[in-house]
């Protein structure tokens, strides 16, 4: 930048005898160069800062009436969408999965996806939905919508009462290696069941009372070495 300023000062002195019109042209040209250099410098600083200040956020996506109507035509009774924003570093990864609990105890992990193809998220949508096939084959169809596609599986279900709810109520910043739980489906064969909702991305309180719990989570972590 000092070299650019010195070049401009020398040329201004050298061309002090130039006519008014030419001088105005020369000043405008110099101003253009200075602005270009400043913008380039600012861009360079921003580029250097972004890798060390990685930030990933997630928040619930509120569907419009039209979107809700369209979803209702697909047969998906319960579904929630979320918006992702931020950039992953080269050695980072986002994992999406569903955790299953029986009587409050962890049983297994389903629909786990990792090694995300996308690394930059700008209002990128993810979702988790459930189709209850209780009247057909007593199963739940689980839908895991991720930035790069859709994963599905079936899970046996003999619950007679269930609830489905969000586990976050505002934009949340992901912390590395700390899962955020986004939605919870709770089921029981009893007549009563506590709501499975929450606000802070933690496991719901009603999980211990539910005979079956299916929880959707996202985890920011290191990329698994192949």
Show which residues each predicted segment covers.
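C-terminal motif of bacterial Sec signal peptides marking the signal peptidase cleavage site
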Residues: 38-41
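Short, Lys/Arg-enriched N-terminal segments with co-localized hydrophobic residues
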Residues: 2-22
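Short N-terminal edge-element motif at the start of the domain
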Residues: 44-103
């Amino acid at each position: 930048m000092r070299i650019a300023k010195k070049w401009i000062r020398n040329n201004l002195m050298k061309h002090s005898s130039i006519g008014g019109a030419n001088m105005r042209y020369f000043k405008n040209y110099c101003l253009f160069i200075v602005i270009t250099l400043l913008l380039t410098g600012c861009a360079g600083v921003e580029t250097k800062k972004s890798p060390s200040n990685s930030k990933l956020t997630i928040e619930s996506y509120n569907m419009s009436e039209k979107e809700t109507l369209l979803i209702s035509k697909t047969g998906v009774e319960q579904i929630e969408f979320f918006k992702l924003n931020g950039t992953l570093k080269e050695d980072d990864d986002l994992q999406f999965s569903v955790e299953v609990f029986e009587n409050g105890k962890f049983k297994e992990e389903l629909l786990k996806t990792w090694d995300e193809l996308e690394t930059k998220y700008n209002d990128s949508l993810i979702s988790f939905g459930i189709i209850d096939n209780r009247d057909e084959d007593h199963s739940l169809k689980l839908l895991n919508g991720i930035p790069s596609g859709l994963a599905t599986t079936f899970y046996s279900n003999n619950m007679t009462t269930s609830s489905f709810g969000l586990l976050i109520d505002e934009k949340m910043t992901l912390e590395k290696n700390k899962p955020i739980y986004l939605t919870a489906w709770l089921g029981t064969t009893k007549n009563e069941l506590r709501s499975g909702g929450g606000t802070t991305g933690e496991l719901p309180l009603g999980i211990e009372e539910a005979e079956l719990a299916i929880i959707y989570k996202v985890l920011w972590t290191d990329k698994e070495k192949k």
